[in-house]
Amino acid sequence: MKKQTVSLLVLLLAASGFFFSCGNTVNKNAYALEFDSIQVNETVHLFGDTAKPACNLILNVAYASQSSDVRLKDSLNTFFLSACFGDKYMAMTPEEAVKKYTEKYVGDYRNDLEPMYKKDEEDKQDEQSIGAWYSYYKGIESHVQLCNTLILTYRIDYNEYTGGAHGIYMS
């Protein structure tokens, strides 16, 4: 009798599990994400003179533009902006962060190098070597390599040259 009761209980549990679970469909788009990117390619010359050295800033920053969960989108963008530009920019929108970062990079370049360049130009030893040391370049390119319900892979390629012999390259 006991064996029959256990078998009947197992059969009842299996049947009820089958009937009640059929109405529970999984929403495969629960965390649907769409990505976009913002691109900047800006070249700024010292003193605004195209004959003088320049800095070149190239940005291609991917960010979450749409999501079924706004909090997910916001937290991803916070992380992306922090990883690309630093913690100072993580509370901004992607558009605002790119604009502020571009302004700061160009402003710092001109403020830091124009006085030194002017002094070197007055001392003028070798025109070509002076120009090479004052030419700067920075590139930050990010993109989403993989995005599914379990994994998001975000890659950032960073390179920078600030005069001298070698630049910096990281991924």
Protein language model features and the residues they cover:
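Bacterial N-terminal signal peptides that target proteins for export
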Residues: M1-L9
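C-terminal motif of bacterial Sec signal peptides marking the signal peptidase cleavage site
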Residues: F18-S21
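Bacterial signal peptide processing site
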Residues: G23-V26
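Active-site acidic/histidine clusters and adjacent loop/turn architecture
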Residues: Y31-L150
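Short, solvent-exposed beta-strand/turn "edge" segments of beta-rich domains on protein surfaces
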Residues: Q145, G163-H166
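Generic short beta-strand segments
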Residues: R155-Y161
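Short helix-loop boundary/capping segments
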Residues: M170-S171
